[in-house]
């Protein structure tokens, strides 16, 4: 049983508090099984640990039994040394950006080790080959380079913070143009507060918001998003509202192109928004890669 970082998301189904959500997540821990957990809030970790003990299940937590030993930026991603349940694995090339993706890699590694009993290391060549082939469409996915356009499907405050940290580390831009659309059941205020903290309060880069919506019936109207963004502390002078996503993308890209290599466009806030953006900005077939081939509808079903 593998548990990723638990945050406040899907509260309509899982509960309104971390404790309630953690209790739901703990339901996947099977008798005499094996719990592999990411680093968690102490309250969440306690619930998971108590459940594992009641189920007589083995358990391992990131940062205790396994984790990232060393992490360095690399072209197209990062270079990792991971500590698993049964060994250490240096010089792993992971073609994904962000500290959180390194942590996800350690979680995946420990899960596979646990599947094989957790008492022997995996073959190094298999580990290297496996991570080298990792793709995560819609997660800091660069679909254009002139201007830079990056899609990220983060749709809750926790995810937006992780993606923002990784985006700033990977691309080091002085001008960020963010095209944002959010679905109605999500914590829009929390998302905007994180965006303000990450791009306005803690960086010298200029930042602009282009608020729009996908075609989903669940999408928050752009005008309502503007009010929420203002409540989150954004200056109205850096906000523009667009009824149609294609217009928001076109203007953001035009502005980024004018600022050349120091600028980029980030599309985020909802899987439906980045799915539609991918369709609108689809590259010619000869330029496509395996990372860009997932259908927007499949992404939306899987992640929202």
Question: Where would I find each of the regions flagged by the language model?
Answer:
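Beta-strand->loop->alpha-helix junctions that form or flank phosphate-binding loops
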Residues: 38-39, 53-73, 94-99, 126-133, ...
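C-terminal helical cap/extension that packs against the catalytic core
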Residues: 41-56, 148-150, 157, 190-263
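Active-site-proximal loop/hinge segments that shape catalytic or ion-binding/gating pockets
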Residues: 270
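Short, flexible loop segments at boundaries between secondary-structure elements
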Residues: 214-218, 287-304
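Nucleotide phosphate-binding/pyrophosphate-handling subdomain across enzymes
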Residues: 1-2, 6-7, 11, 20, ...
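Acidic, Mg2+-coordinating active-site environments of NTP-dependent enzymes
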Residues: 3-91, 105-125
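Short, surface-exposed connector motifs at secondary-structure boundaries
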Residues: 27-35, 170-176, 205-208, 235, ...
């Amino acid at each position: 049983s593998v548990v990723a970082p638990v945050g406040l998301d899907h509260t309509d189904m899982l509960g309104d508090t971390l404790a309630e959500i953690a209790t739901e997540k703990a339901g996947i821990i099977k008798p005499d099984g094996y719990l592999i957990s990411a680093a968690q809030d102490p309250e969440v970790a306690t619930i998971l640990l108590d459940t594992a003990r009641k189920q007589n299940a083995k358990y391992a937590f990131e940062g205790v039994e396994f984790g990232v030993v060393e992490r360095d930026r690399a072209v197209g991603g990062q270079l990792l040394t991971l500590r698993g349940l049964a060994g250490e694995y240096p010089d792993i090339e992971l073609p994904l950006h962000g500290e959180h993706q390194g942590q996800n890699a350690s979680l995946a590694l420990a899960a596979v080790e646990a599947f094989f009993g957790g008492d022997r290391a995996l073959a190094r060549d298999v580990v290297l080959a496996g991570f080298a082939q990792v793709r995560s469409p819609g997660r800091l996915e660069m679909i254009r380079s002139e201007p830079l356009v990056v899609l990220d499907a983060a749709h809750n405050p926790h995810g937006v913070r992780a993606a923002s940290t990784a985006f700033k580390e990977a691309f080091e831009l002085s001008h960020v143009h963010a095209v944002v659309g959010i679905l109605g059941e999500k914590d829009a205020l929390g998302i905007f507060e994180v965006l303000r903290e990450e791009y306005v309060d803690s960086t010298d880069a200029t930042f602009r918001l282009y608020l729009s919506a996908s075609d989903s019936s669940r999408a928050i109207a752009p005008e309502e998003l503007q009010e929420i963004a203002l409540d989150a502390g954004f200056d109205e002078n850096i906000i523009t509202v667009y009824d149609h996503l294609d217009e928001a993308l076109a203007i953001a890209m035009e502005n980024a192109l004018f600022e050349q290599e120091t600028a980029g466009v980030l599309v985020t806030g909802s899987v439906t928004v980045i799915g539609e953006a991918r369709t609108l900005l689809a590259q010619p077939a000869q330029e496509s890669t395996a990372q860009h081939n997932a259908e927007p509808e499949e992404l939306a079903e899987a992640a929202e």
